[in-house]
Amino acid sequence: MAGMPRSRNVPPPPSSRALAPVHRRIVECTRCPRLRTYCRTIAREKRAAFRDEIYWGRPVPGFGDPRARVLVVGLAPAAHGANRTARNFTGDGAGGSGDFLMAAMHAAGFANQPTSRAPGDGLELIDAFIAAAVRCAPPANKPTSQEIANCHPHLVAELAALPRVGVIVALGRVAFDACWRLAAGRGVAPRPKPRFGHGLAYRSDAFPAVIAAYHPSRQNTNTGKLTPGMLREVFEKVRGMI
C-alpha cells in the first residue's frame, strides 16, 4: 500500500564464518554515545525523500568478497546513505560517492556493476572488500579522535578475518592514518609516517601495501579535486599490484 513503510534495511550477510562474529560485534557496538545518538536521531527524523523507509540507524559492518586481496577503507557511513541502507557507499544518489567509487572499481574489474544505489541492487565486489575507519555516521562527517580510536578495533578484526588482503586503498586522510595504526599494531609501522598524497603507494614485506586516494565525497568530486579518471588510475594501479 502506498505510504506504508518498507522493511528495515539490513547489512549484507557476513560473507564468511570468520567475518560473522566480527560483524555482530560491530552492529552491537555502543562505544561512542554521541554517534549512536546521532544515528538514531537521523533514522527517526529521516530525509523527506526517504520518509517511507526504515533506516538502519546502527553501526555498519564492511561487505564484499571474503577472499579479497584488496581492502578499501573509507571514512564513515553517510547519514542518509549507509546509515539508511546499511551498506557502505550505498544510497547517496546518482553521482554520489558510491557511484563514483563503484565506477572506478568496476572499470578495474573489482565490481560487477558501476553503481551502488540500494540493498539488493545486484552489486557484487570481486576480489575486494569495503570497510570504514568509523562505523557510525558522524555529525558533519567529522568523528572525534577518540571516536576514531574507539572504532579502530573493528577494522583490526575485519582485516584479520581477510587473510588474503595484499593491498589496502585508503580513501582520505582519516582512512590513511587508520591504515598506519593497523601496521603499528603489527609492529611494522614505518618511521617517519608516510605522507598522504593521491595515488602514492607504500609497500612493505610484513604488511599489505597501502595506496592513498582522495575520498570520493561530493566536496572533492564536485570541485574537481578528484576526477573519475584519477580514481580509475588508482584502481588500475591496484590491479597491477596484486
Residue ranges and their predicted role:
Residues 1-10:
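Short Lys/Arg-rich cationic patches that frequently serve as NLS/NoLS or arginine-rich RNA/DNA-binding motifs
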Residues 6, 14-242:
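A polyanion-binding, active-site-adjacent surface
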